[in-house]
Every structure is written in C-alpha cells, then in structure tokens.
Amino acid sequence: MWKEFREFAMKGNVVDLAVGVIIGAAFGGIVSSMVADIIMPIVGAVTGGLDFSNYFLPLSESVNASNLSDAKKQGAVLAWGNFLTLTLNFLIVAFVLFMVIKGMNRLKRKDEAASAEPPKPTREEELLTEIRDLLKAKV
C-alpha cells in the first residue's frame, strides 16, 4: 500500500499541482500587494483621495464609525469597498493567469510544430517499399 501511495504521489501531475499551489500562494501575495499598495492608491488619487477599503454601508443605526474596523465592532456593515478591492484583485490574477496560459500554449504549439517531423518508416515499411520498387523495375 505504501508503495502504491508513493508511486501516486510522485507522478508528474501530483508534484506539478503541489508546486503550482505553492507558487500560486506566493503569487497571490504579490497581487494583493499590487492592488492594495499600487492600484488602489492611484484609483483613490484619481477619485479625490478616497480609500475604498473603508467604504461600507451600515446595516444598523448603532454604527456611526468612520472606518471599517471600528464600524464592524459597533454592528453589522456591508463592506462594499473591501469587496471592490478583492474583486479587482481577482480580475488581475485572472488576467495574469490568462496571459501566462496563452504564452505557454503558444510555446507548446511552436514545439509541436518543430517536432512534427514524419516518423521513420518501420523495417516492414522499408521492405514493402523495396518490393514495390523491384516490381516497378520489372514492368
């Protein structure tokens, strides 16, 4: 049983998936930083210095805080600014993954086209070709 599990775990797909998950987690941190530290401040500057992460809609009258963390302590809020930031984060990740996959597919097609040379004829095919040529020569 251990041998079967080891063979399964060492197959290319499982190892590739594990590497992909680890790289994806690291990449997620980079994208989150890009959205929070680069894109959203630019969007905030264009819209007059607004910080979208603190945009919320209070769902009870007891909420009167000016920032999201204090408002959550006071009661229920709809944190639509945070949702907007996370949606932008997702769109950036999806676009980057799309571009990576598109590039990989392009390279794969080039490799397939380069290695698409016809296969070498088998010994049987060579013998049949010789027989055909001999028969043609007699006619």
UniProtKB/Swiss-Prot annotation:
Alphabetized GO MF terms: mechanosensitive monoatomic ion channel activity
Keyword Transmembrane: yes
One Pfam family per UniProt: MscL
Protein name: Large-conductance mechanosensitive channel
HAMAP family for this protein: MscL
Bilayer topology annotation: Multi-pass membrane protein
SUPFAM superfamilies per record: Gated mechanosensitive channel
Similarity remark: Belongs to the MscL family.
